[in-house]
Amino acid sequence: DANLRNQMRIELRRLHQRLATTSIYVTHDQVEAMTLAEKILVLRAGNIEQYGTPDDIYLHPASVFVAQFMGSPSMNMIPATTDGEKLILPDGTPLSGVAASDIRLAAAPSKDVLVGLRCEDLLLDPEGSVQVTVDIIEALGPDTLAYCHPIAGKAGGGVSDQSAIIVRLPGTRRPAPGDAIRLSVRADHGHVFDPASGLRCL
């Protein structure tokens, strides 16, 4: 069960620290990978997708695959375009919060991109550029997960993707299903990916 798996991870970590030897541990469990490893090698169809520390993998994913595989819930992916200076949602609303250097690296003007946003990097903000409607609330004690869908075509809404947008909120903040909320992006915490290749725009 879950408690047994948690205890096993702790025991494996203790064993690794006590032996002080290089160990290779193969797992499909991202929590095991993040908590046990000093370095992670992410494989996709037998090919190396990314190699780095757990922080590297989580904070600077090299591709959409890595971004959505590592981390629970998976990273949100929002379609946008860029003119090389700013990110623009489908209704023309600018999306702030992504580092200017990442936007410039997205290359050609008016290029289609995917903006990756971790659920903890989306903030409730009455002036936010992303407008969504709350579908489901998961109350997890210290945290609340809000599963939302985009409101397309409205001022300040602009996200046309139909997949869920997941927002992590403090446990005491619980909007009701059906509520319309606005979100902004934590400064410099967005990621820009090429939708054709799936690679981070580097």
Task: Please give the residue ranges for each predicted region.
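Residues that scaffold the ATP/ADP-binding catalytic core of kinase and kinase-like folds
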Residues: Q7, H60, Q68-F69, D125, ...
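Internal, well-ordered alpha-helical scaffold/interface segments
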Residues: D55, V64-Q68, K111, E120
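C-terminal boundary and immediately downstream tail of ABC-type ATPase nucleotide-binding domains
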Residues: H60-D83
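Residues located in well-ordered beta-strands
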Residues: T53, F65, P79-T81, Q131-D135
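Beta-strand-rich soluble domains of envelope-associated proteins
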Residues: K39, I57, S72, I137-L140
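Non-catalytic connector elements of ABC transporters
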Residues: M75-M77, K86-L202
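ABC ATPase nucleotide-binding domains
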Residues: D1-F65
